[in-house]
């Protein structure tokens, strides 16, 4: 998959713009604050219906406009194209259109436009809360296992019912038992999908990381959210009193985590910020390879401030790994000269200069 056309209106400081990007490498360069990251944010909105820069809606919409809109034409892996559009207003109303029809959920966008983000906050995947790593894991499972979304929705519904009962005692014994059975069934299905995904991801991650960084002894493991030697139904029964005291369910897939350890310690406590970023890059590129295999198409990479915290050797290694995916990449940087030697001469590269929210396409820097 790739975006052949992008139209952006009223996203932060960007002037209304229509872009025709390269199906491979796109470099957006300009001074800090010029609007480069806002272009990536607009693409992120189109693919996930949310910003990666803010949980609040107001800062995303240009201060003089009532709503922001992003439109994209996607070239599909199987041939043909699909038109996607998203609009959000200041009241929070969201409109999603796919090929002229209203879409039911953002999951439909995500399925058509798989996006990977690598930015200066990427280290949070290692340092941050388990929720961030679950999101990473479930993004991958969603794109390779079509049954995952249904199981995840069943889990969320069962959890809401059980947690409501824990707080308010609104269910009778039979209803409580029924929801516990549904919770256990969905949990087991999700655990099966996640476990299979991690087994596929680990060798690809290890090979990818070896191209970027030599880290002997780094291990990636999966914790499913409850004792591996006990059934979830048994764990729920034994922790019922504690769950009632807390008002929520402590065990289950909603407590799962990915664990990266080095020399017996949490890797985030040992690795430098630059090393953490390379580990995260390897994880996200490995996910891209699995998407390629499962969907016979590529995800799109949004790479914000690529030179940040990486020396020339590692920048070039990362560029080569992205290039080997044969996917579409959008990269921002202040000085595009730092990326001059990153690509094969036959790889299509489009250059865009961003200044005060205006975007102009410039000549390929290798010509």
Curated annotation (Swiss-Prot):
Keywords: ATP-binding, Cytoplasm, DNA damage, DNA repair, DNA replication, DNA-binding, Nucleotide-binding, SOS response. One of its GO terms (molecular function) is ATP binding. It comes from the Bacteria. It is found in: Cytoplasm. GO terms for biological process: DNA replication; DNA synthesis involved in DNA repair; double-strand break repair; SOS response. Gene3D superfamilies: P-loop containing nucleotide triphosphate hydrolases, RecF/RecN/SMC, N-terminal domain. GO terms for cellular component: cytoplasm. ATP binds at residues 30-37. Pfam families: SMC_N. HAMAP family: RecF (MF_00365). Belongs to the RecF family. This is DNA replication and repair protein RecF. It comes from Ectopseudomonas mendocina (strain ymp) (Pseudomonas mendocina). The lineage of its organism: Bacteria, Pseudomonadati, Pseudomonadota, Gammaproteobacteria, Pseudomonadales. The gene is recF.
